[in-house]
Swiss-Prot record:
Record lineage: Eukaryota, Fungi, Dikarya, Ascomycota, Taphrinomycotina
Entry GO MF terms: protein-macromolecule adaptor activity
Full protein name: Uncharacterized protein C19A8.11c
Keywords associated with the record: Phosphoprotein
GO biological process: clathrin-dependent endocytosis; vesicle-mediated transport
GO terms for cellular component: cytosol; nucleus
Listed InterPro entries: Irc6 (IPR034627)
One Pfam family, short name: Adaptin_binding
Chain positions found as Phosphoserine: S194
Amino acid sequence: MRVILVIGRSNSGKLDFIKALTGSLPKGLDDEAFNNDHSGLIHKYNIRNKYFEASVGIWIEEYSNLAETLDAYSSEEAKEVIDSLGAIVYTFRSFDEAEWSLFKNFIDKLQLEIPVIGLHMSDEKLLEPPDVFTPEYISISEEGVNEFNEKVGLDRVREILDCCEWNLSQVDKSFSEEKDDAGDFYLPERFKGSPDMQSTDLDNLMKEMNQIRDADLEKNEKKAKALNLLEKLLGDEFEENDYESL
């Protein structure tokens, strides 16, 4: 099972985030070994949604020099560690453009395909958040949805984590209905003969599926959008394992 890496400076809100996400704090906080540095603490996050249930591990990393820490994670010796990560949450109280750039370069260097969240642990959000796809800037102070009806704040973090591939045995599986890298989506055979599935529905579905395929999104987000689209169109006919036949 892959894990979540929560990384940040001392007093950057790592434990506040974990408490908000899971409802509890890691064991061992009273241990003298963790008095001045929370690196090495572990916890669990239980995911339950309509598609699966999983108990996902959380690793906590604390740094004083981010460049050195990311260099260590970029080394060949750390490849197994990187491969075991399903998501990274970088916590901070005050935005540091230099640190943000370090994370962006780290993601590009390793060609990471997992979600990387820049979580602003402050009561106020940035007026002009970084205009980059990843790390994704999220302000913990926001609630509900934005003007585009998209989840924000902690709900957005949960949404991202719900879409991750947590099972290591499935990491190398290609998402979607693509038969190859350049192919189109294909609908599961059992829907093609459905009396409720009209040709216009099929055409629209395939059009939207191909738009999802071509979108500049990570594989796990494409999968989530495809599943939501199928469920919306097919209603009671939709089965959770339909994406396995895509």
